[in-house]
Amino acid sequence: MRRKQTKKPAVPSARDVLLGITGKDFTIIAASKAAMRGATVLKASDDKTRPLSKHILMALTGEAGDTIQFAEYVQANVQLYGMRNDIELNPSATASFIRTELAKALRSRRPYTVNLLLGGYDTINDKPTLHWIDYLASSAPVPYAAHGYAQYYCLSTLDKHHHPDISFEQGMKILRMCTDELKRRLPIDFKGMIVKVVTKDGIREEEYKDDEPVACP
């Protein structure tokens, strides 16, 4: 009997940029605005983030259809859990749920080609959180993270300058160093970055001007 073929998960393209940085009492999530297919920019103001609750923010990159479908699925289920149980899932439980769903899909005929960062604030333990999750359902809590081109050029900068008790101003300065490095090294216009911050007070969007030219070495 011939075995039925299943769809193999394709490696998500690295053309997008996702960055996550935690500090003393905040988590910064930054995502490139350009929606691209190959070398073509389809949209210059694409928001790759999705709020899952008041204190949890998800940023995704990957195949366009997979990211939208998976984001809506996770968003709806997290909100449904909150309505049924009258309590919000904490960031760690949400990361576990996302990892489980990716693992189930990976073993099915239609895996999701999605990489994501899950930033949040744990109101019970009073600390910021960040989870790095990839399309193979690997998940890890980390102090900083990157997906896409950012993981090739920014992790060394983050490793050098990040420490657990950085202030918000220091976190934004490190983010600026990362985006400047991307502009310096890559011949790609990401159309700027959308920056959002998660604190104990909730999620807010931070103004971030990324139009200044950077001198190449």
Describe these PLM feature segments.
Residues 1-217:
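Long, low-complexity N-terminal extensions
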